Amino acid sequence: MKKVTIRDFIKKKSMKEKITMLTAYDYPTAKIISNTTLDSILVGDSLGMVVLGYTNTLNVTMRDMISHTRAVARANPPQLIVSDMPFLSYEIDVKSAVKNAGLLVKAGSDAVKLEGGEEIKDIIRAIVKAGIPVMGHIGLTPQRFLRLGGFRTIGKTKQEEEQLIKDSLELEDAGVFSIVIENTYVDIAKRITEKLNVPTICIGAGPYCDGQVLVIHDLLGLSEVTPYFAKSYVNLKEIISSAINQYIIDVKTNKFPEKQHYKERES
């Protein structure tokens, strides 16, 4: 599989070919993904919740994102690597936003993702001008859950719906190569997708987007709580627990280690 680029994203939209994206936060996971035909890996700030044990993404730092981006990049996957810019890494001023985006690219990312609408269009424009591809993110933006009043579906009012449409158009105008739409109503996501020339990637926004993204821990059945919009394709939590329990039994009953697991001196 050849390296996926942002041009491939645009091409897939024009050909009506769905884009596939999953999160990954470490080398082993990225190595497994590298042997599949997945289009893109998202090194998401969701690592704060599914890897680091925080209750939200606000505690994730640039140091965290750089470290995990490097781990994923070391697997040398052909997938497009997109790294989240964490909370307060781009909101303060344009200069620091461009610098932080550059640090993620130096760590091995092919593009960065920013949460927000028209209020960050100038920041996006500056990052793109610096030569760094940007993916937008509208709808439920977890870094802004305090302002949104919690993790909720966005677009319940006509005002929210029209703001989402406006945000998507402003982000496209600012130069994003694609936009994640999270946790909004299916008709709104469809409307946005039809209006834009750049592809949309949905998570909890229905089947009419140009692609889908999931947190890999949800897909593998490893999450403590799986969101309603995610699908678990296997229950690894149960499989891992069973393996650990069997290991405990084998050690206590002297079934492990067996002869093939150690060396004896030759007499």
Swiss-Prot record:
Positions contributing to Mg(2+) binding: D45, D84, E115
Any matching Pfam family: Pantoate_transf
InterPro entries the UniProt entry points to: Pantoate_hydroxy_MeTrfase, Pyrv/PenolPyrv_kinase-like_dom, Pyrv_kinase-like_dom_sf
Localization (cell): Cytoplasm
Catalysed reactions listed for this entry: 3-methyl-2-oxobutanoate + (6R)-5,10-methylene-5,6,7,8-tetrahydrofolate + H2O = 2-dehydropantoate + (6S)-5,6,7,8-tetrahydrofolate
Any GO molecular function: magnesium ion binding
Biological role: Catalyzes the reversible reaction in which hydroxymethyl group from 5,10-methylenetetrahydrofolate is transferred onto alpha-ketoisovalerate to form ketopantoate.
Name recorded for this polypeptide: 3-methyl-2-oxobutanoate hydroxymethyltransferase
Organism: Saccharolobus solfataricus (strain ATCC 35092 / DSM 1617 / JCM 11322 / P2) (Sulfolobus solfataricus)
